[in-house]
Structures are given as structure tokens and as C-alpha cells.
Amino acid sequence: MLDPNLLRNEPDAVAEKLARRGFKLDVDKLRALEERRKVLQVNTENLQAERNSRSKSIGQAKARGEDIEPLRLEVNKLGEELDAAKAELETLLAEIRDIALTIPNLPADEVPVGKDENDNVEVSRWGTPREFDFEIRDHVTLGEMHSGLDFAAAVKLTGSRFVVMKGQIARMHRALSQFMLDLHTEQHGYSENYVPYLVNHDTLYGTGQLPKFAGDLFHTRPLEEEADSSNYALIPTAEVPLTNLVRDEIIDEDQLPIKMTAHTPCFRSEAGSYGRDTRGLIRMHQFDKVEMVQIVRPEDSMAALEEMTGHAEKVLQLLGLPYRKIILCTGDMGFGACKTYDLEVWVPAQNTYREISSCSNVWDFQARRMQARCRSKSDKKTRLVHTLNGSGLAVGRTLVAVMENYQQADGRIEVPEVLRPYMNGLEYIG
């Protein structure tokens, strides 16, 4: 959520920055609501002061032995008017808040202006895509050769965009997540967390999934509605529970940065992606990811973004997977991000790079929703923290990249050296 004072006092400047990311802010409506808020605020305060004054008069009149009934009736009437004014003000404030919850974050000045993914800017490349002297098999073909990917079984169990992994392919999938966690915790300074896969609506509001992206989530619903039944949703990313661990907290600044990681399944409805990536593991309703989250001082967040992106890059480098780093343009950034780097790994069967990690600085956008603050050691004043999140990495897509980049002419899959300790020294699948 943007700073309400910024929306209130500098709506034109905010609108100009939001226009860079293709969002039209209704400045006239905001101004009208703000003028109405001021009127209602003054009216409410005046009624409160008048009621307090009249209430004191009752005691004074009673002490003088005067008839207090007219004053009592007047105070009661003022009370009714005050309650009505407060209710009207609360309704207006709720309307303003609802609008604020739909406004995306402001882009950082250095983010390239653009409409969509076609306007993203490549920053760098690492590694050289392998040249094959045989016909490339895609990961689906390789997985079926080794009885490791069973999409038909998943359709029977659940439906499309799910998979059953088996044997050494399932083992490599597990090895990848363990390798990523060990790297981030042992070398990059993150603490490992195990978090719930179901979260409540307050948690989803905190990180910005609600109210705007309710349709992208899988929501729980009792077979028979009960008055006390809780509303939960499956997490779309571990960013949601990890970041919300600091919700409503005041953290001493000398405790920052807080760096957390978790390996979880992620659940997404993939609304709007009909017909895209229907074959294989690239776009699933359920997929595993190792997530990185940092909670930092505001002045440290841009440096933290560079560091976090480097941590994700290290995973790819140790796996020997060619990739490119791009900075997303204003029109392609996520709702809460002010700046985002994507890492795209080389997928031989598609002869292109595909997203495997997204690392974002969110500034104080989530912290304001969560009321997550830090306290200065010198003057004890509090301020909102900055939050960052990044994939380190998407496990299923990493599996795709390993299977395809390490395939052999006979269909075997070489196991990258860094994964062999997690697979009992196995060198090849098949």
C-alpha cells in the first residue's frame, strides 16, 4: 500500500509515476473523497466537542438545582448525530482504503519504462548454451523414458497441470531443493523455516495478494458452510507466510537484516494462462519453490536486491546452467514491486530462455499493510521496514533445465556434480 499522505498531498506526482507502469489513477475521485473526508472529520470533531461541553453543563446545572431534562435530551440528540457522523466517516475511510488497496507500488526511477515483457532489458548472460550433436529430447520425453514423470496419473488423481514424479526423477527433484536450502543457509546467511501451506486472509492482505488477486488463489471451502468455519487459501509462494512473520512487529534495527528461506509447494490457479505451456512442468497448478525473503532497513533495500539476485544466480552457476539476467520494465513488474530482476534459464528443447527466478524490492509497500516496523537504537523512533523476496529457485523449472541441458545421446541424464552427494553418488539417471 502506498503512503496515504503521499496520495493525499501529491496525487498528481503519484499519478505520473503510476502512468509509467500503465496504471491510471483517478486523481479527481481521490481529491473529491479527500475533500469530503475533511468536511466529515471537522463535523465529527465539532459534534464531539459540543457533546462534551453539553455533558459538562448537565453537571453544573444539576449542582445549581436546575431542570436538566432539556440539556439531557440535547446531549442525547448530539450523541445520535455524532454516531451518524462517525459512521459516515468510517464508510468514507473504508472506501478510500479499498481504492488504496488496488493501487500498485511506484516504480523505482531506474526501472525502464515499457508496456510488457517485450520491453524488458537484458542486463547480462552467464554460460554458453550447449551445442547438441543429436536430436534434443524435451523433459517430458526424457521423464517418460525413465518412468519419472507421469502426467496421466496426475490427471486421474486431480486434473490437468499436475504431475506424479517417480524414481530417480523424484529423487533429483528432492535433491535440488535440498541443495538450494543448504546453499542459502550455509553460505548466504538465511535461516531455514517450515511454514503453513494454508494461510488466512489477513496474511494474504499483508503481502498484497488480496484483494486484487483473489482469483489467482485456491481457496478452502467447507462442504457444509458453518458459522465458525475459517477461510483459508493455499499459499501461491512462501513469500506470503515468511514475510508476514514480521506483521505487527517492531524490530530493533540492529537485528536487521532478517534473511529467511523456505522450501514449500506453491499453488496457483494460473487464471488467464489458458493454452500456454500445456505440455510439461513449466506451468503447473502445484510446484515446489525455495523462496528467499529479506527484511531490511529502508536505506539498505536496493543493495539487498542486488545481493539476493546474486544468491539466486549462484544456484544456477553451481548447477552449470546457462542463464540471462533481465530487469523488468514498468509494465511487466508485479503489483507490489518497485524493481525486479528476472533470471531466465536456457531450455534447449524450446531453444530459448525461460523464467526461473524473480527477485523484487517491494520497498515499504507490504510493510505498510502489515505494520512491520523497525526501531532506531539512537532515538528510539520507529519507521516501516523494507521487504524483498526472490525465488532461489523454482524447483520444477530447475529440474526441467537440468534434465534437458544434461541429457545424453542415449537418453541418459547426467547428474550435476553438486547434486551427487544428495543422490548417493549417482552419476547418471538411466
From Swiss-Prot:
GO terms for molecular function: ATP binding; serine-tRNA ligase activity. One of its GO terms (cellular component) is cytoplasm. PROSITE patterns: AA_TRNA_LIGASE_II. GO terms for biological process: selenocysteine biosynthetic process; seryl-tRNA aminoacylation. Its main location: cytoplasm. ATP binds at residues 268-270, 355-358. Pfam families: Seryl_tRNA_N (PF02403), tRNA-synt_2b (PF00587). It comes from the Bacteria. Pathway: Aminoacyl-tRNA biosynthesis; selenocysteinyl-tRNA(Sec) biosynthesis; L-seryl-tRNA(Sec) from L-serine and tRNA(Sec): step 1/1. It is found in: Cytoplasm. L-serine binds at residues 237-239, 291, 391. It catalyses: tRNA(Ser) + L-serine + ATP = L-seryl-tRNA(Ser) + AMP + diphosphate + H(+); tRNA(Sec) + L-serine + ATP = L-seryl-tRNA(Sec) + AMP + diphosphate + H(+). Catalyzes the attachment of serine to tRNA(Ser). Is also able to aminoacylate tRNA(Sec) with serine, to form the misacylated tRNA L-seryl-tRNA(Sec), which will be further converted into selenocysteinyl-tRNA(Sec). Belongs to the class-II aminoacyl-tRNA synthetase family. Type-1 seryl-tRNA synthetase subfamily. Consists of two distinct domains, a catalytic core and a N-terminal extension that is involved in tRNA binding. This is Serine--tRNA ligase. It comes from Salmonella heidelberg (strain SL476). The gene is serS.
